[in-house]
């Protein structure tokens, strides 16, 4: 398992598909249901031919997916959380390092008979 960032598979067409087909409808559903949400919303996706499919939603960071993102954030992550908690995220400027980051997970399963 592992993750990398930035993901070259996410070109502008794919990004717009993700926003229009998944992210915006979720926010519209929150608004329609009068559901106020503050925090992390992790959307696990599979992408085939620039078309996203949702694998999972989580109200937490995904692991190992978050690891390369944290390496690339060039802003104070405390400020990100702080502005999120205050519901002033639009006042926050998230800056990214231009470098690529990769995380790799080595896992072993032992079966004892």
Q: What is each model feature region?
A:
Residues 73-74, 80-83, 96-97, 103:
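Conserved, structured core segments of small domains
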Residues 26, 38, 81-89:
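Oxyanion-binding "anion nests"
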Residues 66-76:
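Helical (often loop-to-helix) elements that flank the catalytic cores of nucleotide-handling enzymes
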Residues 1-67:
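Internal nucleotide-binding/catalytic subdomain
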Residues 39, 76-77:
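Secondary-structure junction/capping motif
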Residues 111-113:
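Conserved small/polar residues in nucleotide/adenosyl-binding loops
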Residues 40-53, 92-107:
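Phosphate-binding site of ATP-dependent enzymes
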């Amino acid at each position: 398992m592992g993750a990398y960032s930035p993901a070259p598979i996410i070109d502008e067409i794919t990004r717009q598909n993700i926003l229009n087909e998944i992210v915006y409808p979720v926010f519209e559903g929150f608004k329609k249901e009068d559901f106020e949400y503050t925090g992390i919303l992790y959307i696990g996706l599979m992408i085939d031919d620039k078309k996203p499919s949702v694998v999972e939603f989580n109200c937490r960071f995904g692991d190992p997916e978050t690891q390369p993102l944290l390496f690339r954030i060039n802003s104070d992550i405390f400020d990100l959380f702080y502005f999120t908690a205050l519901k002033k995220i639009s006042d926050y400027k998230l800056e990214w390092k231009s470098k690529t980051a990769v995380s790799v997970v080595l896992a072993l399963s032992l079966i004892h008979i």
